[in-house]
């Protein structure tokens, strides 16, 4: 019996020894793999073995938090003091990303103030040094940084963070410090752990005010929202919604409710207004009627009422002058109009002038009468013409006539047959006065004995369309050193060189320029407005004229016509369409249509009764006819007297 307890004691002793040895072996193994230095809550760690930068970061993230993210100079001094020297040094948590040095843990770019590079670093040798090491206990640069290739093997310098998921109550930023952390509270929160919410306090609501609130963080606290509305018959005076700010102050004072009142009305220009008021001016149930002076028509309702919502039943009407016909765009005349009561309305006056080289046929001034008609027909501009030029004997004539015939801006060039020379101008232009710039030249027989050898001659130039040309000929027309200057009329710009010279190579110094019309901005057309444009020099260019109109039943708000001016600006802004009252024709159409429909139904019923009686007498077994209109649609009738379609 004595041997049994002894055996049991030996077994327990052996088991304890085995566990102790096992624990010592495990501790030795861990010590071989990892050495560490701790400071209370935030601890630093380093690997005993060397790894590449990527593997070092994986090592730190697996066993700790990440590679060291250095926040200040004190931390660098602490690391240099406590971490042991190692000849290949330590990796830290900085790497080049998108060509910028970045803290990999926070993905924040390294600022210049936080840099701690060694002298002449980073140098990026061989363009592949994208990772950073720290010189721990270096004699020449203790605690300094150096850029290195990421594949090199160094010890991993890790840290374990103090901040946890619930640190700072999830209402502030947790900032690591050596041995602890601090909380930087988000706006609206305060306290050591950001556990408190700023409160704004409750309201003292004025009479007739109703309030609805939401309190995501506590009653009448930061981020609380309150909306307000009034009892029926009252309107809100003040903000409709308030918010509790992070400062603990509401965005405004609570609103008040006042009795509903409609906006004050004014008599329309060229018209009058008469109102029946309630207890106070322009309050609920007030009504106002409107009328216009002679020569003006009311656009809008004759009577408006103030509703319980504090708005009138319709906008205030206006008195609009009678409309005259729009000016045609085919007159080719320059028009300058004054519109005291709107574009082309009563008392509008338009004066007409013609461009250089044309003359006006008709009245130079038109006025819109109170009848809605102009006081005279529209004038037109006709081009000035020059006398027809004969072909020179023993020569040829070539002409360019942009306006047709021998009109203004026509140009003719003259040449002689072989053995003859030109006596007179080589070119003639039709001037605005209706005369050519010179007399027609003649071709004279050349004296072959005394005739000089031909000199340098460049191709003949002509003035660009809508432009001018002025040449200085030194030896002969368009000969050597001839210089020609070009320009454009108002509303056009020159494309090319403004001056050309004839070179000994018989070529001009550049291609002949052209004149292009000044461009205006493209007009944005939105439904339902309709726009028609004439573009003599290209879409939305100088001289382009656009007219506007609205669908039937809608009124044009703005100018009915705009012109692209020589400065590249439109003469007026784009108009809009707004709903208008029924016209007399529309009213008659609807009333007439209804009357015609009723008459048609009565007539159809009588005819149907007669047909049924007739069919019964014949008793031929055929079905009675269904009533059909002449349009072929069952039950549809029209009144031709009021049908607006042709």
Swiss-Prot record:
The chain crosses the membrane at residues 588-611. One of its GO terms (molecular function) is calcium ion binding. Ca(2+) binds at residues 121, 123-124, 146-147. SMART domains: CCP, CLECT, EGF. Stored in the alpha-granules of platelets and Weibel-Palade bodies of endothelial cells. Upon cell activation by agonists, P-selectin is transported rapidly to the cell surface. Residues 159-195 form the EGF-like domain. A carbohydrate binds at residues 123, 133, 146. A motif (Endocytosis signal) lies at residues 634-637. Disulfide bonds join 60-158, 131-150, 163-174, 168-183, 185-194, 200-244, 230-257, 262-306, 292-319, 324-368, 354-381, 386-430, 416-443, 458-502, 488-515, 520-564, 550-577. GO terms for biological process: calcium-dependent cell-cell adhesion via plasma membrane cell adhesion molecules; cell-cell adhesion; heterophilic cell-cell adhesion via plasma membrane cell adhesion molecules; leukocyte tethering or rolling; positive regulation of leukocyte tethering or rolling; response to cytokine. The C-type lectin domain is required for binding to integrins. Binding to soluble integrins alpha-V/beta-3 (ITGAV:ITGB3) and alpha-IIb/beta3 (ITGA2B:ITGB) is cation-dependent. Binds to the allosteric site (site 2) of integrins and activates them. The interaction with integrins may mediate cell-cell interactions and cell adhesion. PANTHER family: COMPLEMENT COMPONENT-RELATED SUSHI DOMAIN-CONTAINING, E-SELECTIN. This is P-selectin.
């Amino acid at each position: 019996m004595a041997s049994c307890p002894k055996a049991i004691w030996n077994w327990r002793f052996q088991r304890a020894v085995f566990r102790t040895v096992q624990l010592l072996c495990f501790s030795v193994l861990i010590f071989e793999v990892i050495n560490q230095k701790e400071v209370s809550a935030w601890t630093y760690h380093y690997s005993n073995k060397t790894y590449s930068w990527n593997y070092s970061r994986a090592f730190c993230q697996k066993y700790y938090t990440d590679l060291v993210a250095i926040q200040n100079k004190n931390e660098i001094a602490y690391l240099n003091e406590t971490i042991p020297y190692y000849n290949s040094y330590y990796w830290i948590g900085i790497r080049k990303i998108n060509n910028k040095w970045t803290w990999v843990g926070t993905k924040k770019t390294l600022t210049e103030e936080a840099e701690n590079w060694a002298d002449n670093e980073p140098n990026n040798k061989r363009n592949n040094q994208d990772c950073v090491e720290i010189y721990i206990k270096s004699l020449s640069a203790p605690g300094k940084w150096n850029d290195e290739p990421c594949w090199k093997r160094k010890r991993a310098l890790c840290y374990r963070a103090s901040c946890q998921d619930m640190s700072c109550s999830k209402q502030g930023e947790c900032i690591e410090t050596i041995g602890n952390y601090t909380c930087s509270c988000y706006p609206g929160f305060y306290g050591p752990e950001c556990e408190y919410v700023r409160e704004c306090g409750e309201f003292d609501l004025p009479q007739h005010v109703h309030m609805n609130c939401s309190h995501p963080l506590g009653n009448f606290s930061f981020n609380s929202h309150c909306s307000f509305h009034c009892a029926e018959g009252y309107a809100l005076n003040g903000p409709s919604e308030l918010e509790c700010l992070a400062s603990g102050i509401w965005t405004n004072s609570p609103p008040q409710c006042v009795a509903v009142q409609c906006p004050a009305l004014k008599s329309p220009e060229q018209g009058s207004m008469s109102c029946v008021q309630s207890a106070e001016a322009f309050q609920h149930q007030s009504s106002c009627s409107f009328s216009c002076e002679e020569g003006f028509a009311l656009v809008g309702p004759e009577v408006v009422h103030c509703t319980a919502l504090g708005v009138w039943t319709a906008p205030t009407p206006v008195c609009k002058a009678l409309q005259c016909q729009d000016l045609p765009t085919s007159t080719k005349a320059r028009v300058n109009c004054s519109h005291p009561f709107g574009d082309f309305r009563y008392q509008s006056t338009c004066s007409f002038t013609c461009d250089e080289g044309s003359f006006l046929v008709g009245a130079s001034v038109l006025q819109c009468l109170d009848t809605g008609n102009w006081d005279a027909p529209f004038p037109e501009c006709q081009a000035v013409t020059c006398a027809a030029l004969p072909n020179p004997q023993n020569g040829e004539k070539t002409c360019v006539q942009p306006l047709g015939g021998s009109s203004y801006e026509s140009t003719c060039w003259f040449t002689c047959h072989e053995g003859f020379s030109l006596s007179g101008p080589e070119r003639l232009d039709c001037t605005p006065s209706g005369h050519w710039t010179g007399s027609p030249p003649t071709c004279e027989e050349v004296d072959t004995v005394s005739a000089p050898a031909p000199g340098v001659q460049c191709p003949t130039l002509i003035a660009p369309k809508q432009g001018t040309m002025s040449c200085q000929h030194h030896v002969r027309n368009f000969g050597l050193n001839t210089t020609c200057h070009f320009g454009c009329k108002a509303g056009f710009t020159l494309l090319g060189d403004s001056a050309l010279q004839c070179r000994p190579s018989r070529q001009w110094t550049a291609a002949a320029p052209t004149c292009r019309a000044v461009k205006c901005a493209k007009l944005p057309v939105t439904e339902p407005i309709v726009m028609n444009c004439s573009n003599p020099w290209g879409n939305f260019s100088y001289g382009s004229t656009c007219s506007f109109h609205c669908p039937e039943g809608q009124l044009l708000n703005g100018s009915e016509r705009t012109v692209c001016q020589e400065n590249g600006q439109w003469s007026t802004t784009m108009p809009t369409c707004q709903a208008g009252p029924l016209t007399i024709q529309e009213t008659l159409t609807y009333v007439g249509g209804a009357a015609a429909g009723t008459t048609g139904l009565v007539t159809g019923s009588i005819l149907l009764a007669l047909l049924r009686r007739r069919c019964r007498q014949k008793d031929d077994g055929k079905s009675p006819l269904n009533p059909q209109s002449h349009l072929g649609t069952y039950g549809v009738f029209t009144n031709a007297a009021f049908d607006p379609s042709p």
